[in-house]
Amino acid sequence: MPKGTAIFIERSKAENMETRVAVMSIIVEKGESAEQINSLLHEYGEYIIGRMGIPYRKRGISIISIALDAPQNAISTLSGKIGNLDGVSVKTAYSTVISKE
């Protein structure tokens, strides 16, 4: 399967799925992971409502906050992929409001 095909299929199915609003908080302790994080965020860009990145130079880390409106599966998958990166921690908080896409 060509790269990006699975995400395309997932998004096609998502058109009639329920979506949730969520906030994903990411702590980056290893700057080498930044390129991979940005690539993943670009891949899921259609679900991103907004993004804020804060370099905390005093501690040598970066803090990223992502607001999403997406199917539960897409949010969980993105969170899992980011959480598996070396030197990266992620937590996600979900709204109880669910809507049809």
At which residue positions do the language-model features occur?
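Long, contiguous binding/interaction regions
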Residues: 2-101
